A protein has these predicted regions:
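Hydrophobic alpha-helical transmembrane segments of multi-pass integral membrane proteins
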Residues: 1-373
Length: 373
């Protein structure tokens, strides 16, 4: 078997990231009303699965295997390739039929293969003890998050698609991926690269905060003081834990300082989300939810992946990307203001902002895909 290079492994998240971004742009264009009889839900499922599994999960898995093991072995590589086949089928399947037999089947197969792959990763891990603990905690969260998808089948069989539990099954999965396994894996890679070491207490605090922050998702379906208190405690712990790392990042490269600033900002926003006024605002406004998810994905994870890609990205591309991401966030949070300011329908404004984002993603990903070395 040929030597498996990092470039070869990276080709899949780069390609799926590009395709997922294009699908998202088509979706944004369709929201302007320019495409008749457009299957919004089908395409949305395709976009979200490709970006979550095809870009983010793939990229983090590649980074973990290349940074914390002696390299990906043959069996793990074959499992990785099997995951790519699943993502490709999901990309097409969701567009054609939405959630149906084929997409449910291959979503499940992807999940089962990912179990096998992360177990192999666990067995081959090497490196500084605290970062290994973060990675293993992330793997545990990966297993925990899958309770959400497994609950969807029984809920559908019971015709409970409109119940709050169906929505919470989805939120449970997303939270323990975005703010569970992915978050901890990102921190492990970040701390290894910056040679920042955490104490056992700091790790426990961070993991505890991420568990408690699921309460913010529960707020979408239930209104109880205990949920508010749990979310507040989780946000408070995370903010304190991040603030204690502030001095360690002051001596790092600018790109890591900015990334840490983004982490801290997201921690503070979690704190604001614990205040009833702001939490109720987000719960009642779908644009706010989209803004939050895009902030995590486009504002934190994508820049992190680009930094770790070891690909030279021009300052103009970085500035352009930051401008368009921030523009899209402000438009989502203050839609009426910007619609009146520019006298343009809000969906067209969002399309223009996302066009800029997709252009930047295309430049970075296609350049990395076709570079010779």
């Amino acid at each position: 078997m040929k030597t498996i290079t990092a470039k070869h492994l990276w080709s899949f998240p780069l390609l799926f990231g590009f395709l997922g971004a294009i699908i998202g742009l088509v979706l944004r264009y369709a929201f302007t009303g320019s495409i008749a009889n457009f299957p919004f839900k089908f395409v949305l499922h395709s976009h979200s699965h490709v970006m979550l599994l095809g870009l983010l999960f793939n990229a983090l898995i590649v980074l973990l295997f290349t940074r914390f093991t002696n390299g990906i072995d043959k069996t793990s590589y074959l499992l990785y390739i099997a995951l790519q086949v699943c993502v490709a089928i999901l990309l097409i399947g969701f567009v054609l039929q939405g959630y149906a037999f084929v997409t449910i089947l291959f979503s499940t197969i992807h999940l089962w293969i990912s179990y096998w792959l992360v177990i192999r990763l666990w067995r081959h891990l090497k490196g500084e003890k605290t970062t290994i603990v973060l990675i293993k905690s992330g793997i545990v969260f990966h297993f925990i998050s899958s309770i959400g998808p497994y609950a969807l089948g029984p809920l559908m069989a019971l015709k409970m698609q409109t119940s709050p539990w169906y929505q919470q099954a989805i939120f449970f999965y997303l939270h323990f991926q975005y703010f569970g396994s992915f978050f901890l894996w990102m921190l492990a890679i970040l701390f290894q690269k910056t040679t920042i070491s955490l104490s056992k207490t700091q790790i426990i605090l961070i993991v505890t905060s991420l568990i408690l922050l699921y309460a913010h998702s529960l707020k979408y379906s239930f209104n109880h003081s205990a949920i508010q208190i749990a979310g507040s405690i989780g946000a408070g712990i995370l903010i304190i834990a991040l603030f204690k790392l502030k001095n360690s990042f002051l001596h790092q490269k600018l790109q890591y300082q900015l990334l840490f600033g983004t982490l801290l900002f997201i921690g503070i926003l979690n704190g604001l989300g614990s205040i009833p006024y702001f939490s109720n605002l987000v719960v009642s406004n779908r644009f706010m939810l989209i803004a939050w998810l895009h902030l995590l994905f486009l504002g934190m994870y994508v820049p992190f992946i680009w930094i770790e890609l070891n690909q030279r990205i021009s300052k103009k591309t970085w500035i352009g990307y930051a401008f368009f991401v921030l523009s899209s966030e402000f438009i989502l949070v203050f839609p009426s203001f910007f619609s009146e300011l520019f006298s343009i329908a809000i969906m067209w404004l969002l399309f223009l902002a996302y066009f800029g984002i997709v252009l930047c993603i295309s430049i970075v990903h296609l350049t990395a895909l076709f570079q010779k070395n």
